[in-house]
């Protein structure tokens, strides 16, 4: 249950050969092209078809789904409830909340594509179901836990084995989801910008909400990173700020006391409900004046002031990571 329901949520970032001067004067055109290329948001209600799902998934989504389908068949043969989810048609889509796609500039004015998303509807369904199952399995001992949400499976039990397989599949789905989105954002860039460009660096694709087996202090253990990124020595990671603040490409320093981990971002200083009560559309417009993005009432909960100061966060973890690039967004797409 410590992983929660947004299994495999994480970041993807890629540097291009484009510079700020290559971007169109009217960035709204670029934002519209990205919004057309990647389904985002959702339709009110719980229908299987929503605004955030594909009606007819493109070929690259089919290709990614083919790598996931065999294990999904095993999962649904034992747990057929997962057939009744947006699985295939959510692959390569953004979602809502704090998930985003951004076009950023680094300190050398080079253009980066950066995005944040996870395992979408199917990951939520897997997480919710197995959390409820763990709570039922622990019914007699649940009172001994500080929170029902920390219910767990005993290693070696049937449900433990099934959960490990299911969560691993959802993490693979999340990684493929980000890869498919990145491909389609790059297509949107090529359609919008006349100048040919190349990809300068290999994409960084990192989870910040996941579990995996690792070696620490001479033992093989399961490490859960909830809002944390793996930061082994020399390992690249991505630490985003809010939609109006800086983000960072980092190299891990391999600090053993943190289990080779670092924070995944700024983190909120207030709830979404409080942000909506405290701030107005005018506040959002002022805070994101330098960004081509939505500035309506439905994204006030994502206003930069609802998040911690990212510079303070980075200073607090200077023994965990080294900053390689500092990015500032010029286009931001939210669901």
Language-model regions: role of each:
Residues 40-48:
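Mid-sequence, gly/pro-rich, charge-dense loop/helix-turn segments that line enzyme active sites
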Residues 21-23:
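Short, polar/flexible loop-turn hinges at active-site or ligand-entry regions and domain interfaces
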Residues 8-9, 25-41, 56-335:
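Domain-length cofactor-binding catalytic modules of enzymes
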Residues 16-19:
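Acidic, low-complexity central loop/insert segments
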């Amino acid at each position: 249950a410590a992983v929660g329901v947004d299994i495999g949520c994480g970041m993807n970032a890629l540097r291009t050969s484009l510079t700020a001067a290559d971007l169109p004067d009217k960035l709204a055109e670029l934002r519209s092209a990205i919004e057309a290329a990647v389904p985002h948001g959702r339709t009110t209600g719980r229908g299987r078809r929503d605004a955030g799902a594909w009606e007819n998934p493109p070929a690259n989504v089919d290709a990614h789904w083919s790598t996931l389908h065999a294990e999904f068949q095993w999962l649904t043969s034992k747990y057929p409830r997962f057939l009744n989810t947006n699985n295939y048609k959510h692959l390569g889509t953004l979602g809502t909340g704090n998930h985003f796609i951004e076009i950023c500039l680094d300190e050398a004015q080079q253009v980066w594509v950066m995005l944040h998303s996870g395992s979408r509807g199917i990951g939520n369904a897997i997480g919710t179901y197995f959390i409820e199952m763990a709570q039922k399995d622990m019914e007699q001992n649940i009172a001994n836990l500080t929170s029902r949400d920390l219910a767990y499976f005993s290693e070696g039990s049937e449900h433990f084995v099934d959960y490990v397989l299911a969560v691993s599949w959802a993490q693979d789905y999340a990684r493929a989801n980000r890869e498919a989105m990145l491909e389609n954002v790059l297509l949107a860039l090529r359609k919008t910008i006349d100048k040919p460009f190349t990809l300068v660096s290999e994409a960084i694709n990192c989870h910040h909400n996941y579990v995996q087996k690792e070696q620490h202090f001479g033992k093989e253990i399961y490490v859960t990173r909830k809002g944390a990124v793996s930061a082994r020595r020399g390992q690249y990671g991505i630490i985003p700020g809010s939609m109006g603040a800086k983000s960072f490409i980092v190299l891990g320093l391999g600090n053993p006391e943190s289990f080779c981990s670092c924070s995944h971002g700024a983190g909120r200083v207030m709830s979404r409900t409080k942000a909506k009560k405290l701030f107005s559309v005018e506040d959002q417009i002022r805070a994101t004046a330098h960004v081509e993005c939505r500035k309506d009432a439905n994204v006030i909960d994502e206003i930069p002031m609802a998040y911690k100061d990212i510079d303070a966060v980075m200073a607090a973890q200077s023994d965990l990571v080294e900053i390689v690039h500092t990015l500032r967004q010029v286009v931001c797409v939210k669901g």
